[in-house]
Amino acid sequence: MSCLDIIADYGLRSIGLGERLLPRSDFTLCHQFTLIGSGMIWNIYFGTLALTSGFILATLLALGKASKKLYLRKLSGWFIFIFRGSPLFIQFFFAYFLFLSLKQSFTFLSPLTSAWAGALFVLFCNTAAYSGEIFYGALQAIPKSDLEAADAYGMSGFSRFRRIVWPTMLRLAWPAYTNEAIFLFHATTLVFFSSFPAWQQRGDALY
């Protein structure tokens, strides 16, 4: 069997396409790299979706924590505190058993007991909390002269946020935010050691 045949048979195995049984003999380097690459499909799925959706929530959390309204500051602060103050691995276990309990009363929540939705939700909340704190720090570090210049030009509200505050916040937060993005992709491997059942995981364990 050539390496191209191995890739065709096992390249998409992690998402349920191709050969289901692992090879029992002649386990070559091509087999190993193909199976590792197949598993990375899920890492890319979790990392990309959690990062893009978490970015939006992180921006809202940063704005909420910097808001003059007390309830927004408290809600944002507690959300960030809970997800930054507890280990991600514990969050996976807690969320899984919480979703199992809720599924009995709310059947539409049943997808959250699977890794593709439930683990993604946990990663989404976790990266949003960490990124939200990073963005909040960047908001506090925006030079007052930039805001005064925006006021001098007559900018206010959303216009000032879109043209001055948001770009400056991203520029200041970018180094720390890229570190968080790298950490998130590393953390996606924890999904397969958590309680959330993933495709092929049970079959491989029996095999």
Which residues does each PLM region occupy?
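Transmembrane alpha-helices and adjacent helix-loop boundaries
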Residues: M1-Y207
